[in-house]
């Protein structure tokens, strides 16, 4: 590029009539004359450079030519990058066709991938590695299929340490992870918790395939609706798919209580909507709320429903905010409105408030949901591990320093309310006669075992924990949410299996 530029400048210089002889300068003035006289240039009798009336025009012409060449090269470089990114997409699509045409007798575990030349992309993080089975290496279902085991209960099984196929992604490389669940980023050196795979008894979970899932979501919207544990699952899902989407073709957008992840390549959206009590409440602000002082509006859900009712897939959850934080804690329920002058405030048991919320949600779904379009899921209770004495530990440490799952089969914590899920199944069952099925994601039992998988003190909640807070795990260790990669990835494997195969 540079040799062509200099040749062009030389040609312009020649056309201007300026000759290329050497310039001869007089000796500089003596020391005593410094500052009194300017050095003057003299030339041979053939030299006319400094006196040429075309000198200014020559310089301007040269500068214009320089900028034209640089702009042209930059434009060609940008187009070349776009073309290579588009080529990556086309190669991936072609590879998917080839994989679909692969004979059924192909060997189990055979992998084919298309790796894009990374040197042509805008940044190292924009590397595109379209590998259709990258995350599926060590599971038992050879082609990511369902195995035909439609009666299999995935929720019954055991955790198997798997250093080959787990984790499904790197938390340090997921650009959309939240700091409150990024445990290895905030100092957790033990990463064993990332390598456990859930193995159901007598069957296998379909392998998660990010590109197939994104294809399923093409021109569709998946929305998670609920509390911070549901946001935990949403972040997990985004991390499970975002690695397979090049930079510039994905985006996270904040809009009040709604956070959207957009995959432009597929025109797919994966949303999280903050609605911890499902109904309208005084806790609807995702930042400003008080867990201990809660009021729900028993007859108001439309403000929330207008956000999620047209989605293709909806995953609700609501459990954490219905647990008692202390003895005697009640839920305040408001009927009517102050505007209409008929406001009435009651206090009910927490579980009764939960029933009020689910019945109102069910009533709305039955009257407004498009059963031919929208599939509905409800995530089971996510157990906390705040009382180490439940498994023989020290309550002062909560779940800090736990590195192994609980090995007691069918272990159930005394603090997990299984009756709430039974109530949810009963209430959602009233939609069946209307042709609306709410699929329960039975995640509770498998999560009960994982006392080792919480952020504890290895997190950031708006600001990093202080040394004093880190030294006081009985107050500041988070044993409710889940490190990522981790347990919520399995919840999403359940969701994937239902969406793709059932």
Swiss-Prot record:
Keywords: Disulfide bond, Glycoprotein, Golgi apparatus, Membrane, Plant defense, Signal-anchor, Transferase, Transmembrane, Transmembrane helix. Glycans are attached at residues 153, 163, 189, 209, 255, 267, 372, 401, 442. The chain crosses the membrane at residues 54-76. It is an enzyme of class 2 (transferase). The active site is at 228 (nucleophile), 478 (proton donor), 481 (proton acceptor). Residues 77-502 are lumenal. One of its GO terms (molecular function) is O-acetyltransferase activity. It is a single-pass type II membrane protein. A motif (GDS motif) lies at residues 226-228. This is Xylan O-acetyltransferase 13.
